[in-house]
Amino acid sequence: MELWLGRLWLYVMLLLLLLQLCQDQELLGPSLQTPSEEDQVPEGLWGPWGRWASCSQPCGVGVQRRSRTCELHPALSLPPRPPRHPEAPQPRGQGSRPQTPRDPQSLYRPQPRGRGGPLRGPASQVGREETQEPRGAQRFRVRDPIKPGMFGYGRVPFALPLHRSRRLAHKPGQPKDSSTAEETLPSQPPSTEPASEKHSPHMQPPELRAQSRSPSAETPRSGTAQTEVPSRTSSAPSDMGIPAPTSSFRDSRSFQGSPEPRMPTSQGAERQPHPFSPVTRSQLSRRHWRPPGSPHRSPDGWLPLTRDSSPHWSLFAPSSPTPECSGESEQMRACSQEPCPPEQPDPRALQCAAFDSQEFMGQLYQWEPFTEVQGSQRCELNCRPRGFRFYVRHTEKVQDGTLCQPGSLDICVAGHCLSPGCDGILGSGRRPDGCGVCGGDGSTCRLVSGNLTDRGGPLGYQKILWIPAGASHLRISQFRPSSNYLALRGPGGRSIINGNWAVDPPGSYAAVGTVFQYNRPPREEGKGETLSAEGPTTQPVDVYMIFQEDNPGVFYQYVTSAAPESPSTMPPALQLQPEMLRGEPLLPSAPRPVRAPGTLQRQARIPQVPPPTHVRTAMGSSAGYWKQVGHSECSASCGKGVWRPIFLCVSRESGEELDEQSCAVGARPPASPESCHRPPCPPYWEAGEWTSCSRSCGPGTQHRQLLCRQEFGGGGSSVPPERCGHLPRPNITQSCQLRLCGHWEISSPWSQCSVRCGRGQRSRQVRCVGSNGHEVGKQECASGPPPPPSREACDMGPCTTAWFYSDWSSKCSAECGTGIQRRAVVCLRSGETLQGDPEAGSTEQGCPLRSRPPDMRACSLGPCEKTWRWYTGPWSECSSECGSGTQHRDIICVSKLGTKFNVTSPSNCSHLPRPPALQPCQGQACEDQWFSTLWSPCSQSCQGGVQTREVQCLSSNHTLSSRCPPHLRPSRKRPCNSQPCNQRPDDQCKDSSPHCPLVVQARLCVYPYYTATCCRSCAHVLEQSQLEPA
């Protein structure tokens, strides 16, 4: 009893002590918390993904975002602590503390940066105001030198500030604290801030993702005016709905000055910190944000990315729990609302054109994109001035949503080129594994393979294999060449390869989400047909064999993802039974089912999965499991049919049959139909589809194909027609009439007569109209009655006649002197010409000749003056029958007086340019021909002598040849001086040339021409040669 009282007293004392400690903790409040409590970071859980934001661009390619928040784990949730605001109630036991009015100071002091001064943003929507910085702080200009590598190829001759800003007068009323902080830094107007920074979101590429925090938010107390210290990272972008989350990236840009031009923006636009600079909690608390629903559009029409507003951690409530989650807090994907108009430039061109009004190196340029870059430079805004050979990096990153390169799928986001993964998320890096699972590691892949060695059934198409959807790395091949053909059918029996009794050529065939390669090697190679595809397939396909001989054996294999369903739920795989089937993971090896050679399996399946463990469900107990005990009756009495498996609930322990309530109803396998085979059915006639009618209208004929078929266990097949000889043979032709043929219809009345008097022609439109009233071709009415006439003669009565004449010709027939002018005169009958001979005008129906107007008259352009001109004759024939030659023509000076021409002295035409008298010409291609020299002197002066010469065959280039025709070879000898000797010259033999003595000296008397010209001189020479002794 005393022991029990002692224990009771001890429990009471411990309870009182515990109450006292709790009261002291409540009185002290948060001011006595240890630093370890404040700095402790609880582990959180990711909340669900939010909705995808709207596309960032109204047309073309843009970016969509969605985010999730890191929430405190439910097991670590703490009661809310009293807020630290002056208007909040104080803890018990403490009075109100006096509030000292003072300007709040920034907890983050930005590092000095070479380009750009302090940035300013508009007032926040939660009550903050912005201090107006004096304009004197903007009077400094960038004076940094140009560094190597800043420009592209080509050289800049001298270094100047890239952009000139107007010097602003320094106002004396500038605050000291701002001037001291700015005088050491070059100032830059807000208008030169790059648009890419203004619009770039805070994101984390997957290759650089780190742990990010998304604490719950607590907005600052409204109503208090806060003065912000200017900071490069203090103001949030004007187009963002919320402060940007913490990023783990470091600013990769140099803190030194850079003369790079910045994207021009509107004056006073808000600036966004670099997306890769670290953001602290103090920065998050000092960023103001634009209320949702007020996006800001840049001047060039390019929309920035926006984010949905969500609560964030607040500096003014440091006691709020700050959970930490690992993983990404934001995802992005490409989007496109509608294509941009063709006349609108691409985004890069718009961004480059924004610098057309901004000076660079002291002058203005028209900028166009420069895309001949690689690597990380693809997401920089590199622009080239038109007509110049250098380019400039205007901004370090293009606007989000810009394509990395024209025609690529990669998109620039925050200066990084991100590629879409198989899940559509930019930068996810997910790729399908070997069995088509997006982001899979291949652990779920299973290789299914086997050999089909059954001899086969009847001739024709026979299904041999079923391939499920999602299969990849397919390969089906025959063991050796044969007359059989592999065929492929898709869902609904749609033919893919070798369908409709037609053999397709080898090649590529696209179907069910992949491309099948059909290969048929020559028989001498000793290889059979092959079907292969990389996959994965989007729908199941059936593999058939067109049997024309016994099956030589078929090997098949494919990779598929392991399905959680039981093997009995899979559709039938084969009708020709396989010799072997493997269902095993790709990485670990599994035992293969062993079967005695020569036996056949009824169905080829993945090996049976062991029965599941005892798991009780709401639909039934685990006392039994479903076991297949047989099949129903076959649905066909002959040929091929189907039956369904019968499942019973069997005890797991004793194997006895139980009632169905003892097994889980949801785990009962479906009774999928399976193929069954009965004895062959009697043959029957199978008629094909009727062909089109032989005529498009009227009676015609149709034909169809008739086959004798018989159903076997493996399916239907064509058999010889003799087997169906005892059956009545259906007709293979029949009469048909699609519609009545067309008829002729008059569609317009008669036109006016072609003449106003006399006999003429008139016409009307006649068309062939079908049964529906529409016009058809004339051949549709060819079988009917002839068409009504469309033309006929018409008589407009007698015509009145009169002479009609035209104007005189404008040119006189003579250039000078008297000439003739002509005009046309006709006799018309009410506007029509008189038919027949013009003399018919003298008849009663013609015009009287006595009143015919004259058709000629004299004309004169003035007296004629004598002129001279060169007259050229026709060119002569080419001097050479082949090869190059010359042509000549006669040129004379002719004087002209009126129509008279006289030949005169060439000196009268000397003032005129003389036409050429010679010109080169080209004959036909020269063939090899005979050439000969001059004849030698005659060997005797009388009583017959001999002359000789050389004869050679030369080619067109004057080289010796042997291809000249022998029958055209000139003779090498000829007789000469056949006159008798001792003849005195008669009186008729005289010299007709004064140069005969020279002819004698030159010994030219041997030639007939000179003998006749200098007869006497040559006769004396002949006499002297005869008198001289031999």
Curated annotation (Swiss-Prot):
Keyword Signal: yes
Known role: Positive regulation of apoptosis. May facilitate FBN1 microfibril biogenesis.
Gene from which the chain derives: Adamtsl4
Region annotated Disordered, chain positions: 73-150, 168-306
Glycosylation, residue list: 451, 731
Main location class: secreted
Endpoints of the signal sequence: 1-24
Residue span, TSP type-1 domain: 47-91, 681-740, 741-800, 803-865, 866-925, 926-982
Pfam families reported for this sequence: ADAMTS_CR_3 (PF19236), ADAMTS_spacer1 (PF05986), PLAC (PF08686), TSP1_ADAMTS (PF19030), TSP_1 (PF00090)
Post-translational modification (record): Glycosylated. Can be O-fucosylated by POFUT2 on a serine or a threonine residue found within the consensus sequence C1-X(2)-(S/T)-C2-G of the TSP type-1 repeat domains where C1 and C2 are the first and second cysteine residue of the repeat, respectively. Fucosylated repeats can then be further glycosylated by the addition of a beta-1,3-glucose residue by the glucosyltransferase, B3GALTL. Fucosylation mediates the efficient secretion of ADAMTS family members.
Name of this chain's protein: ADAMTS-like protein 4
Compositionally biased residues, Polar residues: 176-186, 211-237, 245-257
GO cellular-component term (any): interstitial matrix
